[in-house]
């Protein structure tokens, strides 16, 4: 398999996995802590030696590959809401990479969170609040806000709002990596088969 395509598909799986977690949280108000940690940890790996270093929880990544099969394959399980969130994340990513000040602030704030992890777990409410504020302060204002649908009772809870923003930041991190690896929106139309085939093979590794 083409190594660049493998890495790009891995990053795309990371985007979809974080987006699916946003959807699940918005609907049900809860998320497995290990899965939450796996997505949030990707934000903090800013200088990886290789793409696999960003996605260290392979079980969670498998879910991302399955989402690729659903969203880009011939499956009847395409989720319009996931597609809408994906379009929103990719649009904000384009705005972010064109903003030198935004990228600089992002790196600085992520370093602050890394220091905070000397004292707290990444799923601690204080850390999640900081990650959420990074998204609100730097990303959210770059373009149209992503409108999250779900259970109003869940969406009114501050901790759920913060987890959703933190997960959107994780989706953004994977989107930036996907673009750095050569990912383009047109690939999702014209190179779907190659992406789906790579996801299938990655699932069986």
UniProtKB/Swiss-Prot annotation:
SUPFAM superfamilies xrefs: YcfC-like
Predominant localisation class: cytoplasm
Bilayer topology annotation: Peripheral membrane protein
InterPro entries to which the protein is assigned, alphabetical: HflD, HflD-like_sf
Localization annotation: Cytoplasm; Cell inner membrane
Pfam family, one: DUF489
Cellular component aspect of the GO annotation: cytoplasm; plasma membrane
Keyword Cytoplasm annotated: yes
Keyword list, A-Z: Cell inner membrane, Cell membrane, Cytoplasm, Membrane
UniProt keyword Cytoplasm, yes or no: yes
Annotated family: Belongs to the HflD family.
NCBIfam families: PRK00218.1-2, PRK00218.1-4
Protein name, as recorded: High frequency lysogenization protein HflD homolog
Organism: Shewanella baltica (strain OS223)
Source species taxonomy: Bacteria, Pseudomonadati, Pseudomonadota, Gammaproteobacteria, Alteromonadales
């Amino acid at each position: 398999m083409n190594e660049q395509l493998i890495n790009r598909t891995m990053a795309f799986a990371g985007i979809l996995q974080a987006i699916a977690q946003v959807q699940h949280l918005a609907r049900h108000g809860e998320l497995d802590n290990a899965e939450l940690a796996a997505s949030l940890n990707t934000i903090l790996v800013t200088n990886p030696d290789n793409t696999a270093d960003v996605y260290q929880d392979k079980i969670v990544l498998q879910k991302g590959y399955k989402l690729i099969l659903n969203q880009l394959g011939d499956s009847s399980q395409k989720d319009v809401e996931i597609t809408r969130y994906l379009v929103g994340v990719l649009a904000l990513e384009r705005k972010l990479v064109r903003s030198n000040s935004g990228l600089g602030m992002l790196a600085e704030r992520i370093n602050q969170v890394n220091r905070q992890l000397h004292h707290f777990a990444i799923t601690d409410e204080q850390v999640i609040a900081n990650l959420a504020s990074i998204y609100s302060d730097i990303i959210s204002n770059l373009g149209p806000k992503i409108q999250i649908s779900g259970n109003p009772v869940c969406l009114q809870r501050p901790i759920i709002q913060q987890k959703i923003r933190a997960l959107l930041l994780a989706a953004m991190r994977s989107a930036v990596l996907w673009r750095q690896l050569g990912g383009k929106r047109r690939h999702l139309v014209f190179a779907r088969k190659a992406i789906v085939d790579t996801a299938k093979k990655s699932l069986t590794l």
